[in-house]
């Protein structure tokens, strides 16, 4: 069996490796993804007060030890002291001066005609939660309620301000919030009457769209532009960052974050909780001014709030390539007005860019097909002498101008493009609720009738029959024939937008193959019709 596998050409090995990679990737992501944060058990009011602890930090960045911080367990549904109403969102603030819940009101976010709640249940770290470095002050802060200057804030076309105040022993804590129509806000926190070091959190990540295939955790942009990520279940140590541009808790589609536009940035502490999930805090003494946002990771919206926030949309190691692809997709959407057709146009652009390489690869494959019988003869003749086999094979390639590597380059180039497009389409909130045609009414979810995956598999099968092959043993041919079935199985649960890309890519490849086959056939006929004695 090993001898047979050694005979596989390089293109075949790449195809098999791709299939095996997908076969490994999906089960691994499902069964071995980091365990998501679980709610802690209900505790008494006294226990909760004693558990609240501020991160303990040193003065040097990234070298301080940060203690594990117990999460607040006060129910966000109780003691709501203020409600903020916007055309796109509704926000509730509890008696501890925290954002208890955020509901998205746009049609594509509604679930069973109900507003979509973003934040985790009662045990999670809440946005705007304040903790103090002094344990006594911290305990008091979680026992005393804030009061608000307004019960209801309605935002229409202009910003609205809300002030929250907490009276503590020897000083007063004030939070002044200015809310904007898109869900972003400005925040000023101040302690008056005594100098106090405090820690303010943007909150734990939203839980509206937790997904094992997507990044869930904390994203931070350092002063130099470096993006730092800590995934849920993977917080190995407590860290401190000086001069951060933003810190965001994110799930697949949503985020709660803090940011500043000033060059000095933020001093951010990322603490590790008992489940090894990251918990972000901004550290300050007496006074802190920053801005925040809670809502969807919509690229255009984030860009309009502050361009640097587009880096909150995280594509992993392939971000450098995926982000330009999304910008191209977004431009195509502006051109055609439909995300499905934008994906079709993106696929066409990719196929056109790759066409010169594809053409060379297909010509090379055709040449290899033409000399396949001679290749088999040489393999049979020199099967006991690998050195002579290699020498004679190279002579055969050289004589006929064939390149065994020629058919592999287009495939190799397509794989990073595919994985980049996979990340783009999988993480794009813009595709949520976006329809295409007929039965495809949401490009962010799987095809409910499996029509697109079946069409994709059928197109791959047809493409196989049109593509020249150089099989020299039966095992190679059998593996190749099963690839459409394997890929169809993989793509059944993939978002419709991603399956649409692969299907349309196959259709364009078939059209290219038919064109190239026709061109090569015409050249063969012309060469055959040329008188043998005629010279140029």
From Swiss-Prot:
It comes from the Bacteria. InterPro entries: Membr_insert_YidC, Membr_insert_YidC_N, YidC/ALB3/OXA1/COX18, YidC/Oxa/ALB_C, YidC_ALB_C, YidC_periplasmic_sf. The chain crosses the membrane at residues 14-34, 312-332, 339-359, 401-421, 436-456, 484-504. It is a multi-pass membrane protein. GO terms for cellular component: plasma membrane. Keywords: Cell inner membrane, Cell membrane, Chaperone, Membrane, Protein transport, Transmembrane, Transmembrane helix, Transport. Residues 43-69 are annotated as: Disordered. It is found in: Cell inner membrane. The keyword Cell inner membrane applies. One of its GO terms (biological process) is protein insertion into membrane. One of its GO terms (molecular function) is membrane insertase activity. Residues 53-68 have a biased composition (Polar residues). Interacts with the Sec translocase complex via SecD. Specifically interacts with transmembrane segments of nascent integral membrane proteins during membrane integration. Required for the insertion and/or proper folding and/or complex formation of integral membrane proteins into the membrane. Involved in integration of membrane proteins that insert both dependently and independently of the Sec translocase complex, as well as at least some lipoproteins. Aids folding of multispanning membrane proteins. Belongs to the OXA1/ALB3/YidC family. Type 1 subfamily. This is Membrane protein insertase YidC. It comes from Wolinella succinogenes (strain ATCC 29543 / DSM 1740 / CCUG 13145 / JCM 31913 / LMG 7466 / NCTC 11488 / FDC 602W) (Vibrio succinogenes).
